């Protein structure tokens, strides 16, 4: 398994080009199963999870190819409706394949997904939604089967809790259902809107994506077409934090400030000077150390849980005492013990992290445990004194396109070591 060797401290600064949003690309890739016509998807990031999703689709009989930032997908010859275990176990987003399979083919079998180890990440909301649409569900210990005779049937679905994943599953399946589907208490994330816009491009009618009520008018057949994925707001936020903890400056190109308002507000609160344009964001600390802040993770448009670990690091090296409250996932503080090994002064009280800011971190050997925790350790290694070794960096590869090259361009001394 690969590891990073990072020699610090370095000042991270300069320009970075933001990749397409992983959390849009994955559901959109799986949603290509809804149509038998060719689809071209632009601005698709080069990620381990994307590669796995493409392998999964190809094993079902699809013809999917990733060239640079473009994916060409043709699912007209899909001959299997069971997602193979060896691929599903490594990517939790694989549950998104179930809705399109049952909607178009009347049958889908998916092994319970793997990926990150941050909490339970239950799929019950996906299953409840498909049941409401008329799917018959069989639950095994490690798999779920969804089937329907004929077409799914539109329904009024009130989500028990806000869930991006379940909103996408229901919305995708409903595109081929008979009649109208209404989703209340729907997730409002930009990636939900992006997926909805892709489905609209395929020929379905969706109203209200981005609000807590989404209305989908099902159709019998969808067409093909071309679509461009939005920039990754979490990658954008990560590089903004990289400059903030370096007390330096960065310009994030091909980004969208309109989908990052809460993060930008908190960065300004920490002392950052931020300017924005239509497709760029600049941050400048003017050599100042950031000020400690309070954040509380909430569903969009609140503070994103996927930025929690990065802002924990910001508070670790900030002036004063900062507080981080995690309300979305349990067990998402696995980066904290590793930061403490690097010299952080941090306490965990239930779902809250209290950070007493320190001026300097010290390089050491740490282990990455999940995607966002891992990237916080990478950034910590860049500003720490001495050598930091980060094991199990495959987690970072799941969500960040070419991160070492982008950090090297910003001044980091980071090297990937591959064990033979």
From Swiss-Prot:
Catalytic activity from the UniProt record: phosphoenolpyruvate + UDP-N-acetyl-alpha-D-glucosamine = UDP-N-acetyl-3-O-(1-carboxyvinyl)-alpha-D-glucosamine + phosphate
Subcellular location: Cytoplasm
Chief localization: cytoplasm
UniProt KW keywords: Cell cycle, Cell division, Cell shape, Cell wall biogenesis/degradation, Cytoplasm, Peptidoglycan synthesis, Pyruvate, Transferase
Function: Cell wall formation. Adds enolpyruvyl to UDP-N-acetylglucosamine.
The keyword Transmembrane helix is assigned to this record: no
Annotated binding of phosphoenolpyruvate, by residue: 22-23
Residues modified to 2-(S-cysteinyl)pyruvic acid O-phosphothioketal: 116
Residues binding UDP-N-acetyl-alpha-D-glucosamine, per UniProt: 92, 306, 328
Enzyme Commission number: 2.5.1.7
UniProt-listed GO biological process terms: cell division; cell wall organization; peptidoglycan biosynthetic process; regulation of cell shape; UDP-N-acetylgalactosamine biosynthetic process
Uppermost EC category: transferase
UniProt similarity note: Belongs to the EPSP synthase family. MurA subfamily.
Organism from which the protein derives: Blochmanniella floridana
Stored HAMAP family: MurA
Name the record gives this protein: UDP-N-acetylglucosamine 1-carboxyvinyltransferase
Gene Ontology CC terms, in alphabetical order: cytoplasm
């Amino acid at each position: 398994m690969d590891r990073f060797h990072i020699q610090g401290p370095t000042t991270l600064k300069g320009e970075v080009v933001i990749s397409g949003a992983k959390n849009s690309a994955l559901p959109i890739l799986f949603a290509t199963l809804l149509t038998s016509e060719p689809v071209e998807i632009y601005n698709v990031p080069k990620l381990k999870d994307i590669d796995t999703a493409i392998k999964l689709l190809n094993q079902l009989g699809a013809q999917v190819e990733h060239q640079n930032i473009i994916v060409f997908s043709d699912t007209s010859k899909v001959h299997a409706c069971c997602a193979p275990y060896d691929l599903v176990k490594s990517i939790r987003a694989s549950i998104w394949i179930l809705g399109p399979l049952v909607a178009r083919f009347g049958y889908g079998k998916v092994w319970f997904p793997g990926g990150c180890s941050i909490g339970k990440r239950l799929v019950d909301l996906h299953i409840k939604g498909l049941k409401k649409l008329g799917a018959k569900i069989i639950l095994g210990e490690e798999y779920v089967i969804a089937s329907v005779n004929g077409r799914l049937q539109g329904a009024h679905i009130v989500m028990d809790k806000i869930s991006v994943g379940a909103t996408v599953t229901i919305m995708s399946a409903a595109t081929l259902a008979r009649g109208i589907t209404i989703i209340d208490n729907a997730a409002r994330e930009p990636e939900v809107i992006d997926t909805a816009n892709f489905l609209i491009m395929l020929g379905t009618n969706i109203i209200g994506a981005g609000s807590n009520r989404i209305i989908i008018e099902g159709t019998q057949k969808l067409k093909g077409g071309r679509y461009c994925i939005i920039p990754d707001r979490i990658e954008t936020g990560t590089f903004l934090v990289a400059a903030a903890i370096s007390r330096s400056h960065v310009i994030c190109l091909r980004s969208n400030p309109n989908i990052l308002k809460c993060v930008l507000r908190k960065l300004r609160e920490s002392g950052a000077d931020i300017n924005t344009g239509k497709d760029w964001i600049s941050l400048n600390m003017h050599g100042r150390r950031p000020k400690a802040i309070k954040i509380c993770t909430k569903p969009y448009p609140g503070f994103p849980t996927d930025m929690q670990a990065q802002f924990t690091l910001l508070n670790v090296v900030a002036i004063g005492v900062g507080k981080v409250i995690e309300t979305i996932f349990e067990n998402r503080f696995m980066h904290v013990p590793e930061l403490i090994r690097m010299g952080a002064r941090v306490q965990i009280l239930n779902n809250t992290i209290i950070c007493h800011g320190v001026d300097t971190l010290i390089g050491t050997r740490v282990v990455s445990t999940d995607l966002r925790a891992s990237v916080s350790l990478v950034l910590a290694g860049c500003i720490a004194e001495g050598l930091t070794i980060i094991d199990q960096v495959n987690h970072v590869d799941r969500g960040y396109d070419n991160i070492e090259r982008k950090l090297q361009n910003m001044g980091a001394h980071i090297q990937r070591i591959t064990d033979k």
